[in-house]
Swiss-Prot record:
2-oxoglutarate binds at residue 170. This is PKHD-type hydroxylase Pnap_2559. It comes from Polaromonas naphthalenivorans (strain CJ2). The lineage of its organism: Bacteria, Pseudomonadati, Pseudomonadota, Betaproteobacteria, Burkholderiales. NCBIfam families: PRK05467.1-3, PRK05467.1-4. The keyword Metal-binding applies. Disulfide bonds: none annotated.
Length: 227
């Protein structure tokens, strides 16, 4: 399931994030890639322990905490701490790859299974040319280039790339989620059921049917979830 989360970050958050990034200590992004991905990765990334990274991580986590749609779609169990990257100049693309299935959290014994990938765009599409996040799925190739503050969720199993940036710089935050429900098809069904229950309640209030369907939702979640 590919899903857009509009306005995850506020204009004030974005202004503060870009001010931090203007003086940030960018490093070669290949240092954090797997063996296969490092061969096609050519971007810059912030160290995980720098001030700008920690501040933007806090902004993103606050935005996620305030997004019921994120929780409905992702059903998060664990999350890899958000990272920040930049594309432009001589470090301007990331070729086709699939993310590592398991990521080790820095300075922690924790491991995160990468069921879902998330990218949060930190500057507007007009600031740069190219830089589309291109995701291959069963419906064909999806190209994603969203306004600043918007985010996209997509399956971690997807073959994807970032197209070359030919003007300006593309700034983004990215991370992975281990879901309570491992299968993308199952998460999609639960999300669609949850969203339609919400619409039914908005239109008709609580009824015997919405109560019964809510029970169905939770019984499916109980059947599929791994805690």
């Amino acid at each position: 399931m590919l899903l857009t989360l509009p306005n995850l970050l506020s204009p004030a958050d974005l202004l503060a994030a870009r001010a931090l990034l203007s003086a940030a200590p960018w490093a070669d992004g290949r240092a954090t890639a797997g063996i296969q991905a490092a061969q096609v990765k050519n971007n810059e990334q912030l160290p995980s322990d720098c001030e700008a990274t920690r501040a933007i991580q806090a902004m993103v986590m606050k935005g996620l905490d305030g997004s019921p749609v994120f929780f409905s779609a992702a059903l998060p169990k664990k999350m890899f701490p958000p990272r920040i990257n930049r594309y432009g100049g001589d470090s301007n693309f990331y070729g086709n790859h699939v993310d590592n299935a398991i990521r080790a959290v820095p300075n922690s014994p924790q491991r995160v299974r990468t069921d879902i990938s998330c990218t949060v765009f930190l500057n507007d599409p007009g600031d740069y040319d190219g830089g589309e996040l291109t995701i291959a799925d069963t419906y064909g190739e999806q190209r994603v280039k969203l306004p600043a503050g918007h985010a996209v969720l997509y399956p971690g199993t997807s073959l994807h790339q970032v197209r070359p940036v030919t003007r300006g710089h593309r700034l983004a935050c990215f991370f992975w989620i281990e879901s309570l429900v491992r299968g993308d098809d199952q998460r999609r069904l639960l999300y669609e059921l949850d969203m339609n229950l919400l619409r039914l309640r908005e239109r008709h209030g609580e009824t015997a049917e919405t109560t019964a369907l809510t029970g169905t939702y939770h019984n499916l979640l109980r059947m599929w979830a791994d805690t």
